[in-house]
Each structure stands twice: as structure tokens, then as C-alpha cells.
Design a protein with these regions (language model features):
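Structural alpha/beta surface segment adjacent to cysteine/selenocysteine redox centers
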Residues: 17-108, 112, 190, 194, ...
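A short alpha-helix capping/helix-coil boundary motif
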Residues: 2-3, 89-93, 170-171
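Residue-level signal for beta-strand positions within conserved beta-sheet cores that form or flank
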Residues: 1, 30-32, 166
Length: 214
């Protein structure tokens, strides 16, 4: 069965996490299917030579990329179509809500092992964290996402109605706090209308408040 929405995520991005919680809330109310797909910030920045992109900073995107490798192993190894989404939820709850970024960077292997166990997933998937054979699929998903939106964006990228005549993709929405209930559905309807409107290219502002994970 085709998904109603493709959601391309990198697990270390706090903005993608907030958007994903909004999407999950709406899916529970509207009963639509999400396919959780990959976009790697580590790959997007692999040729980044800017001063601020230090080895210490690079450790964050690489942590996310390891999570995507494990996610790809889960995609291949599990019959449950919700398994990748459960994996993303486990990472996001710990990393963003639980503020475990420093612990994750300090010992990524142990940290990811604990998340696999907590999510009821095979601990053997941990071997994928440093397995470059998963990079081909992750890169293909990353390139697919950017082919739908253009290359000057990040994560999340959403595709409404993938594979249909009215398929539409965009970067975002970037929101500081995930709405719930009726407010979440109202935002969904507005965003879907904008995304699928012929000729719609961009709506944006750069002012943001700090992310709120509650």
C-alpha cells in the first residue's frame, strides 16, 4: 500500500523532530500512512569547508548518519512498516526531549544499543552504525528528496501524495512547537493546500524562537 506522505528526516535535526511529532499527531486523527525516509545532513555537508564546520561540529551530523544506517538495517530486517518510525521516535525522545546529546556523542555505540533495546528492536542492528554498505541507499534517498525540492534546503522534506498526479514536496514546515488536536489538523490542511497549489514556490521567514519539545 502506498504511503500518503513521505517524510525525509535526519534524527539529529531538532526542527525535523518537532515537525514529525505534528505529522504523527495528524496521522492519528486522519488515519493516513507515513513512510519514514532518510536525508543525511552528514552527506549534505561532506564537502563543507567553512570555518564553523569543525570536527567537533561534524560529530553531530555523523551521529545522525549512524542512526540512519541503523534505520536502514531496520528497514531491511523488519516486516513491520512502522519499525523505522519507531526507531526515529526512540532517537528523538532521547536526543531532543531527553536532552541526551552529550551522552550520545560521548559513546554513540552504547547509546544506540540502549535505544534499540528500549524500542524492542534487535540489538544486532547496532552493527550497521559503522557499516558503509548502507550509505548507497541513504544517499539515494537524500538525492531523491532534493530532486523533489531543489538543493538549497535541509530537513525535514515532506512529499504529499507520493506517486500520484498531485504529488507535491517542500522543505518544512519549520515550527518551534508541535501543535496538537484540532490546531494540528488546521495547520496540516493549510500546509497541504499551499504545497499542492500550482505555481507555489516558497513562503519563509528567518526569525525563529527556540525549539520547544514539550
Amino acid at each position: 500500500m502506498a504511503a500518503d506522505l513521505d517524510f525525509f528526516f535526519d534524527p539529529v535535526c531538532p526542527w525535523a523532530w518537532i515537525t514529525s511529532r505534528w505529522v504523527v499527531n495528524v496521522s492519528e486523527q486522519r488515519n493516513y500512512e507515513i513512510e519514514w525516509r532518510f536525508i543525511s545532513l552528514w552527506m549534505l555537508n561532506e564537502n563543507n569547508t567553512r570555518e564553523w564546520y569543525t570536527p567537533q561540529y561534524r560529530a553531530g551530523p555523523y551521529l545522525g548518519h549512524q542512526g540512519l544506517r541503523i534505520g536502514d538495517a531496520i528497514r531491511l530486517g523488519e516486516d513491520d512498516p512502522t519499525a523505522v518510525g519507531r526507531w526515529y521516535t526512540a532517537i528523538g525522545e532521547a536526543l531532543h526531549v531527553g536532552a541526551q546529546r552529550e551522552a550520545a556523542r560521548g559513546d554513540a555505540v552504547s547509546w544506540y544499543r540502549g535505544l534499540l533495546v528500549g524500542a524492542g528492536l534487535d540489538e544486532g542492528y547496532l552493527d550497521a552504525a559503522d557499516d558503509e554498505s548502507h550509505d548507497e541507499y541513504i544517499r539515494a534517498d537524500t538525492e531523491l528528496a532534493l530532486s523533489r525540492t531543489g538543493k538549497d534546503v535541509g530537513t525535514p522534506i515532506l512529499t504529499f501524495h507520493p506517486g500520484s498526479d498531485n504529488e507535491a514536496s517542500f522543505f518544512g514546515p519549520v515550527i518551534s512547537k508541535a501543535p496538537r488536536g484540532a490546531e494540528a489538523v488546521e495547520l496540516w490542511d493549510a500546509v497541504e493546500k499551499l504545497a499542492t497549489m500550482s505555481g507555489m514556490a516558497e513562503i519563509k521567514r528567518s526569525n525563529r524562537i527556540a525549539p520547544d519539545f514539550t
